Amino acid sequence: MNKEKIIDCLFIVAKSSVKTYQSLATTYSAIEPPTWALLLAQSTRSVGFKVNIIDANAENLTEKDILVRIKDLSPKLICLVVYGQNVNAGTTNMSGAIYLSEYFKKNINIPISIIGSHVQALPLETLKKEKSIDFVFTNEGVYALRNVLKIKNFSSDNLSKIKGIAYRNKDNIFINEPESIVPNEKMDTDLPGYAWDLLPYKNKPLDLYRAPMWHAEYDFKKRTPYASLQTSLGCQFGCNFCMIN
């Protein structure tokens, strides 16, 4: 193993589209760039940590394909990022993440964490149900992840001191006090953009991603390359048709 390859955190985006969209996943469903994985990767490496991203959805990777890459990269921590462009997509995409975490737990000895909207809403329930997950992040995870990566090992004693996570200690589940979210005045420094260079591509950047059909005027040729951007965190409005409200 090449020690120079060892990285602090490997962000993995699971392949959930086939279970969600079945045969439509092959050509019709959109493939979104993993916005939050990109933001977290850029945030953590901006303070000196070595990170990488595996987007199994974009590359259509099997669990065995991913395992080979994990063994090559030898990360200290695996972070499954489970989000979607819609708020409820985090729950829909959990199936792919759990499938991978169970497979990884049987084949490698690397701590596994999850960050995403589903575990933010149900951290204790997720840990009780999913034995393959070692800990989850209970909010956006920017500062909690940095603090997790600072510790020498992921023992229960060390994890108990980290704000913004829930973790297991044998058969017991614990939730720590919340970590602060990124304030507006630190948005540009603590979330300094997207780690676009870590995304996979075939011939040119972003060519593995494709827009929803209605974004491309129902023209297949216009669907790729595709990028999606978030210009803010949260929303100041209170639309009565929004599921959040």
Predicted segments with their positions:
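Acidic, low-complexity intrinsically disordered segments
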Residues: 2-245
